[in-house]
Amino acid sequence: MAIGKRLLVNKPAEESFYASPMYDFLYPFRPVGNQWLPEYIIFVCAVILRCTIGLGPYSGKGSPPLYGDFEAQRHWMEITQHLPLSKWYWYDLQYWGLDYPPLTAFHSYLLGLIGSFFNPSWFALEKSRGFESPDNGLKTYMRSTVIISDILFYFPAVIYFTKWLGRYRNQSPIGQSIAASAILFQPSLMLIDHGHFQYNSVMLGLTAYAINNLLDEYYAMAAVCFVLSICFKQMALYYAPIFFAYLLSRSLLFPKFNIARLTVIAFATLATFAIIFAPLYFLGGGLKNIHQCIHRIFPFARGIFEDKVANFWCVTNVFVKYKERFTIQQLQLYSLIATVIGFLPAMIMTLLHPKKHLLPYVLIACSMSFFLFSFQVHEKTILIPLLPITLLYSSTDWNVLSLVSWINNVALFTLWPLLKKDGLHLQYAVSFLLSNWLIGNFSFITPRFLPKSLTPGPSISSINSDYRRRSLLPYNVVWKSFIIGTYIAMGFYHFLDQFVAPPSKYPDLWVLLNCAVGFICFSIFWLWSYYKIFTSGSKSMKDL
């Protein structure tokens, strides 16, 4: 009995989420013969979660004349089906003009081609605008394409990352599966892709593949995957300085000068871009069409930010009316300078110390710099820094896990105004509660309400254990107090938003309050990522 107790006490140091319902649900599959089962359980549960979110409304449902992102994606499937490639980036730009790189256009073409096989009226040119089938056939098809895209691009990349890291530091298979489930159950991505409606998981999955190839030291393949990510959604450029610095350093500085490696990487990068843009040149009208594509995917004329977003420009615009005091060209320059200053230390650190265990942190610092300071940022863009942030759920450091959990909650909170507009109130609340409960954030409550017969693992039923009396909070008192304070602020905001009307003179006051809370938290987390970069240089992947 004493040995068993000693093992139970030592266990939390080995597993990331020992004190969580997720650990307990997967605990019965610890025997060697059952270790393949957790992956299938996680896979099925991740798909079910996405399906249940998809049962709700989507962006722009029943809101003519422009509707929303659902209609935008459907419209791109429509025009790529019926128009020559030379018109894809020119057609009716006042409606939902195509404004993503060619890989998104080809993806839309393929999905539209398959969808037309089931029902051509879904994508009939011009006649299908705002189409909402009474039998929900179109909605079902569109939702299923996002799930399949998740399964093909995002799921394998995440599972591979957690397995690679787990094997590197001798983590148990069950620990690897728990880390994968925490990443796959991230609520923000699920709600935007499967609720609001987008295909961000394709871009993020391709980026994760690029990260995996860096870990495996397949540098040319990493470059190819990253270019594919950029060519699907240009926001992947938020990671570009780090990938550039890492690949350059690994070619010219570490372990030694290797011109052959640099040549192969450069060729792979240029060849991938050339292959993807070649159809626009040869089938779409030459350089004129490529120029129009680039003009569409970098819409500088729209302004420094769109709607309300938790970044520097939107929050400080309350005090300094940038659009009134500066020209668009000036704002472009200022945002460029601020963004470069923000990511330059991370880029230099990557160039001088291209270490694998620093990759998540430098990617966080770089992408968060773009989110906070760059031009034309949307609230959904927080999904870009959330990828490397959420990959840190593979960490075994309690403090890292607590901060990752907290910033994921903050990110979800900043998406509330958008999700509220889409009518995704229930999905927002349930996703927040479920994701936090699964990783143990309600551990101080759970064992007091669940009988032991419903707890298959050892930790959740141990009410007296210290791990069961605390939620996922850091050890540091200052951090703990600040995080609790932000949760109180978030709760207070939701109370105001639900029960108190904003002043008629300031109708966006509550939304700006949401942005202010998010901006403060994101800025502090961004600084924390730099702290980790400069204090973790001598560590290894085992210390991630």
From Swiss-Prot:
For this protein, what is the EC number? 2.4.1.267
The UniProt entry lists membrane topology as: Multi-pass membrane protein
| Keywords linked to the UniProt accession | Endoplasmic reticulum, Glycosyltransferase, Membrane, Transferase, Transmembrane, Transmembrane helix
Q: Which GO terms describe its biological process?
A: aerobic respiration; dolichol-linked oligosaccharide biosynthetic process; protein glycosylation
Q: Does the keyword Membrane apply?
A: yes
One term of GO molecular function: hexosyltransferase activity
Reading the lineage from the top rank, the first entry is Eukaryota
Pathway where it operates:
Protein modification; protein glycosylation
Does the entry feature the keyword Membrane, yes or no? Answer: yes
Pfam families named in the record: Alg6_Alg8
Where does it mainly reside? endoplasmic reticulum
Compartments, as annotated in UniProt: Endoplasmic reticulum membrane
Cite the ranges annotated as topological domain Lumenal. Answer: 57-104, 167-223, 285-332, 378-398, 447-481, 530-544
Function summary:
Dolichyl pyrophosphate Man9GlcNAc2 alpha-1,3-glucosyltransferase that operates in the biosynthetic pathway of dolichol-linked oligosaccharides, the glycan precursors employed in protein asparagine (N)-glycosylation. The assembly of dolichol-linked oligosaccharides begins on the cytosolic side of the endoplasmic reticulum membrane and finishes in its lumen. The sequential addition of sugars to dolichol pyrophosphate produces dolichol-linked oligosaccharides containing fourteen sugars, including two GlcNAcs, nine mannoses and three glucoses.
| Annotated protein name in UniProt | Dolichyl pyrophosphate Man9GlcNAc2 alpha-1,3-glucosyltransferase
> Taxonomic lineage per UniProt?
Eukaryota, Fungi, Dikarya, Ascomycota, Saccharomycotina
